[in-house]
Amino acid sequence: MYTVIGASGHVGSIVATELLNKGLSVQAILRNPTKAAQWQEKGAKVALADLLNYDSLATALKDTDTLFVMTPPAFHLEDPIGEHLKMLDNIAAAVQQSSIRKIVYLSSIGGHLRNGTGAILKLYDMEQKLRLLDIPTVGIRAGWFMENFGESIKQAASEGFFYSFINPADLKLPMVAAKDIGHLASLLMQQELQGHRMIELSGPDVYSAEDVASVLSTLFEKQISVKVIPSEQYQSTYRQFGLTDAAAKLMAEMNEGFNNGHIRFENKEGIEQIYGETTLAENMSFTIEKEHMNFRAK
């Protein structure tokens, strides 16, 4: 059985759906019981489990053969790094008590770095933990999610501009669509794996916040501009979004790491480089259509 941790997220839902479309036996691990019915209707088995609760996780993974792991951002926790380490301990222990033969997991650009990455440190910890398992694993270090601009699109549609943490606005970053991440993960889960592999995944090009504004200007048929958020306002901005102080601090450090060039792909021998097919324009157009936004937004 193919089990997907994080099936309700952008990437996890794509992974589970693609596996189901192949006629494979899929289990979606969820925290929210209200989302169970939609997966059951698609033909998936559903298990309710909390990554901070070993017993529920071990029960859910008992009959799993192949596992996809994507951990939650933990923005609501007072100690995101410490609590995430507990999640990783539970995952590793549950895997060792199961019949799991291989794992595909989602890491991030910068996942090889121990310092200066803020929230990405959680994924460094994940890489280190899962590499200790005596079964094959493959990690996907994904670039900046194009979906991170979801709220920016809404703001641009209504106000004609959006705020960006990317500073300067013309800074080019490796970006990738969740669609391409999920597709790669589903393919890897169906392969025979050996050892501990690492893949660095980006889109067909690098993009900036100014590129986002240009794409949205074309799609909305009006001028869209970008306003850069000063770094000294990062933490307060994230706290306004509802993050805990600790989570806001981590996100601020992460953004500064991107902006100063510290967070990057490792790009060394032995690490596979793969490029997704979805362009920024295609991703933005899809998001607008999905949200039923008016292309001629005022």
What are the residue ranges of the model-derived segments?
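Oxidoreductase cofactor-interface core, primarily capturing Rossmann-like NAD(P)-dependent enzymes
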Residues: 2-27, 31-38, 52-54, 62, ...
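Short, conserved active-site loop motifs that form the nucleotide-linked donor/cofactor pocket
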Residues: 43-44, 137
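Conserved Rossmann-fold cofactor-binding substructure of NAD(P)-dependent oxidoreductases
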Residues: 45-65
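Aromatic "clamp/platform" in nucleotide-sugar-dependent glycosyltransferases that forms part
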Residues: 83-88
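Short glycine-centered helix-capping/turn motifs at secondary-structure transition points
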Residues: 160, 261-265
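Terminal hydrophobic/aromatic helix or amphipathic segment near a protein terminus
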Residues: 216-261, 297
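Amphipathic terminal alpha-helices
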Residues: 266-298
